[in-house]
Amino acid sequence: MMPLAMAKTGETVIIRKITGRDDVRQHLAELGFVVDSQVTVVSEAAGNLILQVKDSRIALSKAMATRIMF
């Protein structure tokens, strides 16, 4: 498994695991980051990743993206 922060722009991956404290995992789940869901890296800007999750685009810091494994 690799962290989402390592995915390249345009790449679509399937989330396999989310690490971190319960509150962090809950927050990510509320944003749509759940195991077995697809995420597409739209772009990278200023240390953040712009991600397509379901029908939404979400900016996520690289630090937070390291907690999401694919």
Predicted regions, residues:
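Compact, glycine-rich, soluble single-domain proteins
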Residues: M1-F70
